[in-house]
Regions:
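Aromatic pocket-lining residues of Rossmann-like dinucleotide-binding sites
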Residues: 61
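P-loop/Walker-type NTP enzyme "switch/lid" segment
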Residues: 6, 10-40, 48-51, 66-145
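Glycine-rich phosphate-binding P-loop
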Residues: 45-57
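Conserved catalytic-core segment of NTP-binding enzymes
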Residues: 2-3, 64, 129-188
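Short, Asp-centered acidic motifs that coordinate Mg2+ and/or phosphate
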Residues: 44, 115-117, 149, 166
Length: 188
């Protein structure tokens, strides 16, 4: 459910997306606690290969009492824009990277006051340059003071992940192979 708010802001209901079995909840809680230890005080986390898993990890931090900003920074796909059927008019990460001098109101509120979202936005050509990519650090810095945790769904190439304090690679069980996972880590 999407509700239009003042000045073209949107509010989304995340309840259906974050529904998990008890076993899933337990797994995400354990993962969250391990990530906190591994990040060692860092607050910006990238997750590759699984946008919905990234969303659930972000929500797990919310369940632990943190204020979280989820950023759909996987410019090559619009999983969440498509899921919420928001169309192509919503500004997001891609818009900032293309025109960082313009001030956009990118935050999308959810029905949980501790959980906000920034969507991908519109990238007509599907490509960001190295200069635009380097703006991601500035983008992260703009929001890191306002939240306890930033969780980014990163592209599979890890171009965005390199600006984060840590990266999680989430494989589907059917595609996981130890050698391919090691090679992917080396590429990142």
């Amino acid at each position: 459910v999407i509700q239009e708010r003042r000045r073209n802001m949107f509010s989304v209901n995340i309840d259906k997306i974050v529904v998990m079995t008890d076993n899933e909840k337990k797994c995400y809680e354990e993962l969250r606690e391990n990530l906190k230890k591994e990040l060692n005080g860092g607050k910006v986390l990238a997750i590759t290969k699984n946008g919905m898993g990234a969303f659930k990890i972000a929500y797990s931090f919310v369940c632990a009492g943190e204020k979280v900003l989820f950023i759909d920074a996987d410019i090559m796909s619009e999983i969440f824009l498509g899921k919420y059927k928001l169309g192509k008019n919503l500004k997001g990460v891609a818009d900032f990277l293309k025109k960082p001098s313009q001030m956009y109101d990118l935050i999308c509120k959810t029905n949980n006051p501790q959980f906000d979202i920034i969507f991908t936005g519109v990238l007509d050509d599907g490509v960001i340059s190295e200069d635009e990519e380097s703006m991601m650090k500035q983008f992260i810095d703009m929001y890191s003071d306002k939240y306890d945790r930033l969780v980014l769904s990163s592209d599979v190439d890890g171009r965005i992940a390199k600006y984060c304090d840590g990266t999680v690679i989430m494989y589907e069980e059917s595609e996981f192979g130890e050698l391919s996972a090691e090679n992917y880590v080396d590429e990142l």
